[in-house]
């Protein structure tokens, strides 16, 4: 766990000064036999592990097919701006109809929705399993048991928007200190609190490997402030279907259930002590070869 958190924080630091780069170099782009441009840039949201896992998986799969793949990390706003400008080719972690709806409303005319590859996504407020509350209503009445703290993630995330605009006012959590910084910082606090047997409340989401790593429970949301289950969509830039017609078709057909996703996330983030995800993903691919081969068949 410490290695995972350190790795992620280093990655975030390295990408904080990211400058968007165009996908097209000078001169004609190199093309594969299947009609796709050889170069692919996948934009990945900072801190969202299901997107990191899916992106690393597709990077490995596409490199087997002869593509040159770059993963570029950024927060959602620059990702969608970059997609709309064709600075990125595709991103694999758009949650709809709630979490990233504002971005799609702003940039959607210049994007291509390639469909949902997982339909089980859910925003949550999670607490340690033995916490003295079971609902968000009870959290408001027992905030002192959590030192009046609710630990969030990146300020620019859709989860932060839903928490600030919907959850906090709906359940009267305004007197709690709502702390936003980053997903790694939230996970570090979660690690420390559960290790010390202390109460903690965090913003989280399913699917996420933390549910296997920590003794957690989701607080019930009787008012539906966090919304219903969402789909995790792939979105391409406005030229993506022209520059990568074969890959666009593969992504439209892409489906990954939560059990498979948990398996990949656990291998990458829970069981992995390496700074390099590549070998871990390659091993996971070998263990799931029949399914992986179906992605490009």
Give short role names for the model-derived ranges:
Residues 88-92, 162-224:
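Ligand-binding pocket segment of bilobal, Venus flytrap-like solute-binding proteins
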Residues 122-132, 230-245:
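A bilobed periplasmic-binding-protein/Venus flytrap-type ligand-binding module shared by bacterial periplasmic
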Residues 1-21:
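Sec-dependent bacterial lipoprotein signal peptides
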Residues 109-156:
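A conserved helix-loop-strand patch within extracytoplasmic ligand-binding domains
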Residues 35-50, 67-72, 147-151, 251:
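Short, well-ordered beta-strand elements
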Residues 20-33:
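Bacterial lipoprotein signal-peptidase II cleavage site
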Residues 46-49, 71-82, 177-189:
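Short helix-initiation/N-cap motifs at beta->coil->alpha
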Residues 58-65, 145-176:
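Ligand-binding cleft/hinge of the Venus flytrap
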């Amino acid at each position: 766990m410490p290695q995972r958190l350190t790795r992620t924080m280093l990655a975030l630091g390295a990408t904080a000064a990211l400058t968007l780069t165009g996908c097209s170099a000078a001169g004609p782009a190199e093309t594969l036999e299947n009609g796709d441009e050889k170069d692919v840039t996948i934009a990945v949201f900072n801190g969202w592990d299901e997107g990191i896992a899916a992106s690393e998986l597709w990077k490995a799969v596409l490199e087997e097919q002869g593509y040159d793949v770059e993963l570029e990390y950024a927060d959602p706003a620059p990702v969608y701006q970059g997609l709309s400008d064709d600075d990125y080719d595709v991103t694999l972690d758009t949650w709809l109809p709630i979490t990233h709806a504002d971005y799609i409303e702003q940039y959607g005319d210049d994007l291509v929705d390639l469909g949902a590859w997982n339909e089980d996504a859910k925003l949550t407020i999670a607490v340690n399993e033995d916490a003295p509350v079971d609902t968000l209503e009870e959290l408001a009445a027992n905030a002192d048991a959590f030192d009046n703290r609710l630990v969030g993630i990146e300020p620019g995330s859709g989860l932060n928007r839903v928490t600030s605009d919907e959850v906090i006012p709906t359940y009267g959590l305004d007197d709690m200190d709502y702390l936003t910084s980053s997903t790694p910082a939230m996970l570090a606090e979660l690690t420390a609190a559960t290790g010390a047997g202390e109460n903690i409340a965090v913003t989280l989401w399913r699917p996420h490997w933390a549910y296997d790593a920590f003794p957690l429970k989701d607080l019930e949301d009787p008012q539906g402030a966090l919304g219903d289950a969402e789909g995790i969509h792939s979105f391409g830039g406005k030229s993506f279907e022209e520059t990568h017609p074969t890959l666009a078709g593969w992504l439209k057909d892409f489906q990954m259930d939560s059990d498979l996703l948990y398996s990949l996330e656990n291998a990458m983030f829970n069981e992995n002590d390496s700074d390099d995800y590549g070998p871990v993903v390659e091993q996971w691919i070998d263990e799931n070869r029949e399914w992986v081969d179906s992605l490009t068949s």
